[in-house]
Amino acid sequence: TENIITYYAYDDCGRLTWVVTPKGSDLLSAGSSFSPESDFAKQNCYVYFYDEWGRVYEKRFPGREPMYIVYNRGDRPMMIQDGLMREKNQWLTFHYDGTGRITSQRLATDSGLTLLTRETLQMSFDTNSYPQLYSSSASQILTQHVYDRYPTTMPATLAFEEISDMTCDLTGIEPETLLDTSTTGLPTYEKLTAITDSSIGGEYHRAYYYDYKGREIQRVECDFEGNILRTTSRYDLIGNLLAQRESYTHGGTIDVLDRTFEYDSRSRMTKETAQFNDGEQAVVAYTYDDLGQLIGKTYGTGAHAIHETMDYNMQGWLSEKSSELFEMKLRYYDPEPYYGGDAYYTGNISEWWWQHKNVNGNYDADNNTYIFHYDDLSRLNDSRLTYNESEDITDEFVENGITYDKNSNIITLNRSSLSSDDMKNYRFSYSGNQRIKDETSNSDYEYDANGNIHKDALTGFYIYYNLLNLPTVIYTEGDMGLYYTYLSDGTKIEVCGYDDNEPTRYAGSLVYNDGTFESASFGGGRIVGTNNGANSEVHYFLTDHLGSTRVVAKVTPTGREDLDRKDYYPFGKEWTQSGMPTSDNRYTFSGKEQQHLRGQVVNYADFEARFYDSETGIFLQQDPLSEYSFQVSPYAYCGNNPINRIDLDGKRWDDPIQDAEIARQIKDAINAALNALISQEKRINNRINKINDNTKLSQEKKEERIAKEKQKLAEIDIQQDNLTYLSEGIDKMGSEDNPNIFTFETVEDEDGLTSTNTDGVTTMRNNGTFYNRVHEATHGAQIALGDLRVNQNGQALGGLSTPAREIQAYQNQAVLAGYETLPFSDHGGRPTKLKGITAPWIKGIKNSNGQYVY
């Protein structure tokens, strides 16, 4: 056992100035000192510089050139420059409205003979005389945002259109309230720019329309060629999405993807349908147990539908998935004794058994069992495989001999296979977190100024990145390459090969290849174009617990057909097997899109914010949120535990078992509290009956005492309503069919914040205490049930008012964790009863800096 130590240094004001990563900590010695310019700092440290106002004006991360930030007098970032921008003398500028909302982002190029320094630019803002570089009309507009109203200059093609034939039950929805023009505080229009490998240009327009609850009911997008994507949504009264239509007008053709959703009384999805134009309809049905756990999915209809069942252990961890085409089992603390597996009580998977079946539901392939071992940091260091539950362990299709440095960079990784091409014994050397050399091939890696891998030593690929740190070109010698186009918000809209006349285009859920419809995604798989896009058929995806596609299947009136089978090494590389059905499906490991070059799979998967290399288990780019995990390499995939964790969007990894465990703890507390409230209710009702039966009391005394008891009943009703609401919200958050992702994140010394990023991921950040988790889970429930919308900074965009949502959260906190966990307020102190949690009390709460929170 070795110590893994991360050092944090603070200035006299208590501000974080240095973070020395575990690998760098080994290089420290008594009396040693390092400057920010030293190689030690550049490779191993996070360094922050503050101005006299306490603002961070420079950030330095390991393996990256510094980032500079310039502020205005209102402490808002006005200009930012990273290493790649500095090479081109560029600055990213931000422009705001009177309420502090960003109205535009621009890219300004300093073409002067003497380049402006950060200090010079800051001095201009400090004197309220904005520098010409910031105000220059020659700067390139990346994004423009409009709020509260619809601009008169907005293209007419973005006008709202009522969709009257959407196939959903509109019971309870008043048609005249579907579109509401009260858009104060909401984004209404934005103009984006297309970013290619060689240019920034091509306008992309987007308009948003809302109902009276501030829910988006239509989004209209128009690209630089005049193609229009109109996404229309319908909700029920409590915010469940009932129907959604994506209508794409392109080249004189209108394609329509219709999706509908049904729910039970607890807002759990019970059915989803999807249909492209007038083609085959996809149908997926869901069933749940009494605990709210998903226990069944049915793909398709009729006699040949695929029925998938799920089972869980007593902790609520998934233990089994079984269908007619694929079956798997997970063991955590009860491994088979003859495999030599360890028992893990932390949620780590010890053994993973699986087997494919033929279309008749009969086993027609070997069953496989992976046995996993982890180090003390839950990093995978060994995997073994056995066939057909034999006690003989094979070296085929395994990754083992995995070792790490103290920053969790992979030092060694051995892979064995039936295919000689897949057999590898990797040995890597590093400078800080950057992989410098593959010792086995004596090949070197190269990086750009932002720490992105520029040359992949193993494949020979060269990768170039845009200002968003997203790949714009992946190429190798011989004019073989992939060229990407993104919008300025990071949305991928095109990819093409070097000599392709027609790119693959992405429009919402729709994908077009060579100008014809290729596929559309839905909750249970993809609808795939046939006959050059003239027709379509439904492909259902059977996945494992990581969301990786294991079987692609069709359901027809005459039978089932398995089109594709996939198995994976632990870090996500596909097995090379003969005799297995294959298809051209690109959405494989973790459900992410694999990149293809002239029909050949490139071991890079698009995780949205970053690309992942499953060959060696690292990301090509640094984690954009690396400041939340100083102790782990910004290139590491899921903290090097790919068996138990998933990466949602390339920005952070999620541990579903940890999330499920937190949710289970809260649910257990809710159930215990509800049972206690029922007992209290019975006792109060008994007392009321006794009061009524007491002949010695006057009628006036009876009414007086009964009124007091009924006040207690009213408080119990509030508690029951709040707890039931929270329970239903947690069920909604954890539903596999929920299109949005909810996750808990523990950050020490955090006051708690629930936010939703631009990809729809809601993070309930908390300080690790039970009361704080209950509080933030309540906000998560409000979002999941459609009563609250927040942005990536946690600011409300619509729904419940601040007092209403906070009263509910603090009431749940008090009931489940105790009134002593409530904060002290200048207006009422610390309440001891539910009625003390009021709007004035909330407004008197201060944070640790003495500032009012609300």
Language-model-derived ranges and their functions:
Residues 759-773, 799:
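Short pre-active-site segment immediately N-terminal to the catalytic Zn-binding motif
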Residues 12, 16-18, 24, 28-30, ...:
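A motif-centric feature for acidic-aromatic and gly/ser/thr-rich catalytic loops and repeats
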Residues 557-577, 608-610, 614-664, 668-684:
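Short turn/helix-capping motifs enriched in Asx and small/polar residues
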Residues 77, 86-122:
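Hydrophobic or amphipathic alpha-helical targeting/insertion segments
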